[in-house]
A protein has these predicted regions:
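Catalytic-core segments of class I nucleotidyltransferases/pyrophosphorylases
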Residues: 96-98, 105, 110-123, 135-139, ...
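N-terminal nucleotide-binding beta1-loop-alpha1 segment
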Residues: 1-16, 39-41
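Conserved beta-strand termini and adjacent loop/short-helix elements that scaffold enzyme active sites
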Residues: 51, 72-75, 131, 158, ...
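Hydrophobic packing residues within well-ordered alpha-helices of enzyme cores
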Residues: 11, 57-61, 222
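Short, well-ordered coil/turn elements that cap or connect secondary structure elements
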Residues: 17, 41, 64-66, 94, ...
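Conserved N-terminal catalytic core of the sugar/cofactor nucleotidyltransferase
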Residues: 2, 24, 28-101, 105, ...
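Short beta-strand-to-loop element that shapes/binds the nucleotide-sugar donor at the catalytic cleft/hinge
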Residues: 52, 127-146
Length: 234
């Protein structure tokens, strides 16, 4: 599931005429950075939700085959991160699935991070497994840290603690978490907190470089980070 329905208000004026997932970084759209990472991890089918200027995204992904794209339409109203997943559940099936934000991406170092995430997944112990980055790996992140990792891999809220990690915009989730949820606007944070309470929110520290692009001013640093990361990978 690729979350691509947001308004991208902070990216104006660029997003006055295009949805944020189609903003290009180093010649590739933010959406394609995420979809290419999914393809590299062996994902054959991805659901992309749309709301703002949706026809541009629909047209952009129409010719993709790796992964094949199904559209979850939110033209009638934004549903936030979790509400969008609830609407898309019939397309996502009964098995655990990836969630990827369309406005962040990363440059892998070694084994692809989404492959590592799948290998780390243990449905017997986990309801949600988050990919995490530390502040040193991040470009464009203006906030604080999100989670602290215990020795057993479980997470709790970091509340900005300097030793905390950032949620890197990719996760694996159990679809049954959303079985009783309403198709109404609500955030994934509700499910993160419920999983923390039950000891079933886990995290995996990513390798490589993590890049988030929130405003037009963030584009140049993002492209510099891509160039640097790709040079280091050679």
């Amino acid at each position: 599931m690729v979350l691509a329905a947001g308004l991208g208000k902070r990216m104006r004026p660029i997003t006055d005429t295009m949805p944020k997932p189609l903003v290009r970084i180093s010649g590739k759209t933010l959406l394609d950075w995420g979809l290419d990472s999914l393809a590299e991890a062996g994902v054959e089918r991805a659901v992309v939700n749309v709301h703002y200027l949706p026809d541009q995204i629909v047209e952009h992904v129409a010719s993709r085959h790796a992964p094949r794209i199904e559209i979850s339409d939110e033209r009638d109203g934004l549903l936030d991160s979790a509400g969008g997943i609830v609407r898309a559940l019939p397309k996502l099936g009964a098995a655990p699935f990836y969630i990827v934000n369309a406005d962040t991406f990363w440059i892998d170092e070694g084994e692809p991070n989404l492959t590592r995430l799948a290998l780390a997944w243990d449905g017997g112990r986990m309801d949600i497994l988050l990919m995490l980055a530390d502040l040193k790996q991040a470009t464009g992140h203006s906030g604080s840290t999100d989670f602290l990792v215990a020795s057993d891999g479980t997470l709790r809220r970091a509340k900005g603690a300097p030793e905390g990690l950032i949620y890197a915009g990719a996760a694996i989730v159990q679809p049954r978490l959303f079985a009783a949820a309403a198709e109404a606007p609500h955030s994934l944070n509700r499910y993160f907190d419920e999983a923390i309470a039950s000891g079933r929110l886990h995290g995996m520290r990513m390798s490589g470089s993590w890049i988030t692009v929130g405003t037009p001013d963030a584009i140049a640093p993002a492209e510099a980070a891509v160039k640097r990361a790709l040079a280091e990978a050679q």
